[in-house]
C-alpha cells in the first residue's frame, strides 16, 4: 500500500485526499491519504515523523512550500526554479522535492479549457510564491510575453528579470496596469482568501480569459471578471486536480485520468 498525505495549516478544507483516492480507485493502487495539520513553526518535525511511519510521499500546501523546499535532500529542476516544493517523494534514503503547480495550471488551461498559450499576452496579478511556481511552465508554452503586476513593484520587476532567460517578461506596479488588451489574466494574489480583489483598471479584462488560481464556485476575482466582461472565466479547481495528477504520477509512475475527477468535484 502507498502511504501519502498532505501537510498544511489550515488543512481541514483540503480536497487532496478526495482527489488522490479517486486516482487510486481508477488506477487500481491501494492508497492511504491523510490530512496532517503541521505546526506553523515546525513543519520539518511533522514531515520527518510521517516519513518514519513509512511514507512514500506527500503534498505540501500553504504555508509550508518554502519549508518543504528546504527540507528536501534533492530538488527537481522545476522545484529549483520555482523556489518552492509542493510534492515530496521518498525514494530509499532520498527526499526528492518537486513542484507540480505550474504544470497543473498549464494542463488545465490547455487540456481542460482548450486555451492556446502560444503567442498570447498574459498578465499575472501578484509576484509571490504562487507566481514563481507557475512562470517556467507558462513560458515554455511560448506566449508573446508575460507581464507581472504587483502592489510592491520591485518584486514583480525582480521576478521578471529572474525569468527573462526563459521568455519575454516584464514587471510593474498594479496601479500601472492600463487598458491595453491582454489575452489571459491570471490572479495569483491571495486577496480572494479575504474576499477582496486588487484595485486594477477594469478595461483590461474586456474579452480576456480570466483565471483564478484559487478555487470556488464564485471568487472575488471571478466576480470582477464577470462585471468587466471577461470572455472566459474559471477558478483553479482544474489546476488543483491536474497538479495532483502530476504528483500521483511522480509517486507511482502511472498517470491518472483527470476528466472524471474534475466532473465529480464540479458536481
From Swiss-Prot:
Q: Where does shikimate bind?
A: 14-16, 61, 86, 101, 215
Report what the protein is called.
Shikimate dehydrogenase (NADP(+))
Gene3D superfamilies given in the database record: Leucine Dehydrogenase, chain A, domain 1, NAD(P)-binding Rossmann-like Domain
Source organism per entry reads Ruthia magnifica subsp. Calyptogena magnifica
Q: Does the keyword Cell cycle apply?
A: no
Question: Keyword annotations for this protein?
Answer: Amino-acid biosynthesis, Aromatic amino acid biosynthesis, NADP, Oxidoreductase
Q: Offer one Pfam family short name for this entry.
A: Shikimate_dh_N
Residues in the active site? 65 (proton acceptor)
- Amino acids binding NADP(+): 126-130, 150-155, 213, 236
Q: Which GO terms describe its cellular component?
A: cytosol
Which stretches are transmembrane? Answer: none
Complexes and interactors: Homodimer.
**Which CDD domains does the entry mention?**
NAD_bind_Shikimate_DH (cd01065)
Catalysed conversion reaction: shikimate + NADP(+) = 3-dehydroshikimate + NADPH + H(+)
The organism's taxonomy opens as:
Bacteria, Pseudomonadati, Pseudomonadota, Gammaproteobacteria, Candidatus Pseudothioglobaceae
- The answer on whether this UniProt entry bears the keyword Ligase reads no
Q: Which domain of life is it from?
A: Bacteria
**One of the GO BP terms on file:** shikimate metabolic process
Q: Sorted alphabetically, which NCBIfam families does this protein's record hold?
A: aroE, PRK00258.1-2
Q: What is its EC number?
A: 1.1.1.25
User: Tell me, what does this protein do in biology?
Assistant: Involved in the biosynthesis of the chorismate, which leads to the biosynthesis of aromatic amino acids. Catalyzes the reversible NADPH linked reduction of 3-dehydroshikimate (DHSA) to yield shikimate (SA).
Question: What family, per the record?
Answer: Belongs to the shikimate dehydrogenase family.
User: What's a Gene Ontology MF term here?
Assistant: NADP binding
- Pathway(s) where this gene product acts: Metabolic intermediate biosynthesis; chorismate biosynthesis; chorismate from D-erythrose 4-phosphate and phosphoenolpyruvate: step 4/7
Amino acid at each position: 500500500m502507498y502511504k501519502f498525505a498532505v501537510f498544511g495549516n489550515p488543512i481541514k478544507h483540503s480536497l487532496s485526499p478526495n482527489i488522490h483516492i479517486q486516482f487510486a480507485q481508477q488506477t487500481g493502487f491501494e492508497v492511504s491519504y491523510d490530512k496532517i495539520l503541521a505546526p506553523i513553526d515546525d513543519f520539518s518535525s511533522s514531515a520527518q515523523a510521517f516519513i518514519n511511519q513509512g511514507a512514500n510521499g506527500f503534498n505540501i500546501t500553504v504555508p509550508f512550500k518554502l519549508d518543504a523546499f528546504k527540507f528536501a535532500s534533492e530538488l527537481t529542476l522545476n522545484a529549483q526554479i520555482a523556489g518552492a516544493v509542493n510534492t515530496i517523494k521518498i525514494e530509499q534514503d532520498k527526499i526528492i522535492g518537486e513542484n507540480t503547480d505550474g504544470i497543473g495550471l498549464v494542463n488545465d488551461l490547455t487540456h481542460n479549457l482548450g486555451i492556446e498559450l502560444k503567442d498570447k499576452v498574459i498578465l499575472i496579478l501578484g509576484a509571490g510564491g504562487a507566481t514563481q511556481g507557475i512562470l517556467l511552465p507558462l513560458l515554455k508554452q511560448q506566449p508573446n510575453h508575460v507581464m507581472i503586476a504587483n502592489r510592491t513593484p520591485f518584486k514583480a520587476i525582480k521576478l521578471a528579470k529572474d525569468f527573462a532567460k526563459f521568455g519575454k517578461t516584464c514587471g510593474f506596479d498594479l496601479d500601472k496596469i492600463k487598458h491595453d488588451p491582454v489575452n489571459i489574466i491570471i490572479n495569483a494574489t491571495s486577496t480572494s482568501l479575504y474576499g477582496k480583489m486588487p484595485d486594477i483598471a477594469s478595461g483590461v479584462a474586456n474579452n480576456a480569459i480570466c483565471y483564478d488560481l484559487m478555487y470556488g464556485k464564485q471568487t472575488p476575482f471571478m466576480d470582477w471578471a464577470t462585471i468587466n466582461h471577461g470572455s472566459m472565466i474559471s477558478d483553479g479547481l482544474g489546476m488543483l486536480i491536474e497538479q495532483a495528477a502530476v504528483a500521483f504520477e511522480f509517486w507511482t509512475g502511472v498517470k491518472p485520468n483527470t476528466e472524471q475527477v474534475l466532473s465529480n468535484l464540479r458536481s
